[in-house]
Regions:
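Conserved protein kinase catalytic core
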Residues: 62-64, 189, 225
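Acidic, Mg2+-coordinating catalytic module of metal-dependent nucleases/exonucleases
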Residues: 149-156, 160-161, 165-166, 196-250
Length: 250
């Protein structure tokens, strides 16, 4: 009888992200199969050729150069047939700490991750980046864009850890812009008067489960919903729609 990872977790009594895996749509090797109708090439006009991709990381501390990257997740975005920006696909990986990485006990207590748990099924940084970047690059191409731009809640933090991992692995095909980002802290502060994700998400009328918070996949998906909600409300207020008339590139 074959025992699934989920059954192993249940039998071991392990709980939470420290032992588990991302949901079934995440954490598997990317096959390259993507629906050609999922992404709208008009998205390329919306952000001057950049595809927003929401990223969240969970880490062993605050210093991207010295502290471990433990989880990374990404959510691609697309334009639907009504011109609204919506989440498209989600991807995530558990990551093995790089050699010599710092693991701050306070950070691990905060995010609930046990980096040594045998059922994490974590990958090396390079393998995790490869698995995550492949579908991001495919989404960029399908959307008619030239590059991905990272969206995050405190985006400088997530981009810092992504860039540090890319540098450690000498990774040559990073799909993300090296320094430009969209930050939902700023956007939600402006639109909702809230800068904390756990407060901004409910304020925007989006469900929030504190028991799943501080997992990279969950936080990335909720950040994606928040980003889309703010942008779509801005559109409904009568803001210009650049995907219809891109105008001059200045």
């Amino acid at each position: 009888m074959t025992t699934s990872p989920e059954q192993l977790i249940a039998m071991s009594g392990a709980k939470g992200r420290s032992a588990g895996r991302f949901p079934s749509r995440c954490g598997f090797p990317y096959s390259g199969a993507m629906s050609s109708s999922l992404y709208n090439p008009l998205m390329a006009n919306r952000f001057r050729g950049y595809l927003p991709v929401v990223v969240d990381v969970e880490t062993g501390g605050f210093n991207a150069a010295t502290d471990a990257l433990l989880e990374i997740a990404a959510v691609t975005l697309r334009l639907d047939t009504d011109g609204r920006i919506v989440p498209a696909e989600s991807f995530g990986e558990h990551v093995l700490p790089f050699e010599g990485a710092n693991l701050d006990p306070k950070a691990l207590a905060f995010n609930g991750i046990d980096p040594t748990h045998p059922l994490r099924m974590a990958k090396t940084e390079k393998d995790a980046l490869t698995s995550l970047f492949a579908p991001v690059r495919a989404a960029v191409k399908e959307s008619g864009c030239k590059r991905a731009i990272l969206v995050g809640h405190n985006a400088f933090f997530d981009l810092g850890f992504v860039n540090a991992a890319v540098a450690r692995c000498n990774y040559k095909r990073n799909p993300f812009h090296p320094f430009s980002t969209f930050d939902t802290v700023t956007l939600s502060g402006m639109a909702l008067g809230q800068t904390v994700l756990a407060r901004a998400v409910p304020m925007a009328g989006i469900d929030w489960d504190p028991n799943q918070a501080h997992g990279a996949l969950y936080d990335a998906e909720k950040t994606a919903e928040l980003f889309c909600r703010i942008l779509n409300q801005w559109r409904e207020l009568g803001a210009p729609q650049p995907w219809q008339d891109p105008g001059p590139d200045v």
